[in-house]
Amino acid sequence: MESLVKLHIGLIDMLASCCLLCFSICLESIQLEERFLLLILVMLLLRVLKVLILSFRICLVRLFSVIILDIMFRKDGEGNEV
């Protein structure tokens, strides 16, 4: 499951890099000052996206570890392990 989460994060990082590349190509027609400000804005948005992805990853790992531990140590009504 951990590898699936890493693959998901890698795909999102690759998508963000492609978006940044397309955005930089579109910036060719914009003035230098505006280009710099837009680039800073995009970099900040990408950092926020990365933080959200990492927090989502931590929540997913915790959720699946709780589910796995629940399945491993499940007990019946009399306290015996199933």
From Swiss-Prot:
It comes from the Viruses. This is Uncharacterized protein ORF6. It comes from Chlamydia phage 1 (Bacteriophage Chp1).
